[in-house]
A protein has these predicted regions:
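Structural motif
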Residues: 1-13, 66-67, 95-98, 102-128, ...
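Alpha-helical recognition/docking segments in bacterial nutrient-uptake
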Residues: 1-67, 127-128, 134
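Short, conserved loop/helix-junction motifs that constitute active-site signature segments
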Residues: 33-38, 76, 146-151
Length: 210
């Protein structure tokens, strides 16, 4: 919660030489962070707010998502419909849904958005953009009970790559930033006082699920 975030931040202020923090919300800068020296603070991931006075390495959950899906369009064209699974209470920018919808409209896809994998079953000729890793595992289990093959009967596109996506089923295609690049830049900020103000590009990791 915002209250817990504020409490943790308040207790840590003045105790460290550098602060590497993911802001609580993507849309609004947390006021508690204004108490930290801007030269000591690096903002990560969320950042759809004015942050010109700070170093940041962020994801673009809006246009980045759109462009990432565009890079996968040849694979997505195999499917007649795109479905986004976006859990109601997931701490992921809600604006991603609007860019998903806009992509589908711009490129002629039928589309739907569900709040959980319990609300939908794998269907033939449908590709699913699934944000949460646990939902992907649940969805693969469902598909096996229905004798549907991921990457052939239906598709899956994940958000944010993980090592497990390389080995789940025949590999899960993911839209992701380069986490190694982010880690290297964090180290530069901490060790060498390197300043950053950038959004990392959204990349496509194409695997068997699409």
């Amino acid at each position: 919660s915002q209250r817990l975030f504020n409490t943790l931040m308040q207790e840590s202020i003045g105790n460290y030489n550098k602060y590497i923090i993911m802001n609580f919300d993507n849309e609004q800068f947390s006021d508690i962070l204004r108490k930290i020296d801007p030269n000591k603070l690096l903002l990560l991931d969320f950042g759809k707010f004015n942050k010109d006075a700070y170093s940041y390495i962020c994801q673009d959950f809006d246009r980045g998502l759109y462009l990432g899906m565009l890079s996968a369009i040849d694979s997505l064209r195999k499917y007649k419909k795109l479905v986004m699974v976006f859990p109601k209470y997931l701490k992921h920018p809600q604006s991603s849904k609007q860019y998903f919808i806009q992509f589908c409209i711009d490129h002629g896809f039928l589309y739907e958005i569900y709040e959980s994998t319990e609300e939908c079953n794998p269907q033939q000729n449908v590709a699913y953009l699934i944000i949460k890793q646990q939902n992907i595992v649940e969805f693969i289990k469902k598909s096996r009970k229905l004798n549907l093959k991921c990457g052939y009967d239906f598709g899956i596109l994940a958000y944010n790559d993980t090592p497990s996506y390389e080995i789940i089923d025949n590999g899960i295609t993911a839209l992701t930033i380069d986490w190694r690049e982010m880690g290297e830049k964090i180290a530069e900020f901490v060790l060498n006082d390197r300043k950053y103000q950038e959004y990392l590009p959204t990349l496509l990791r194409l695997r068997g699920s699409l």
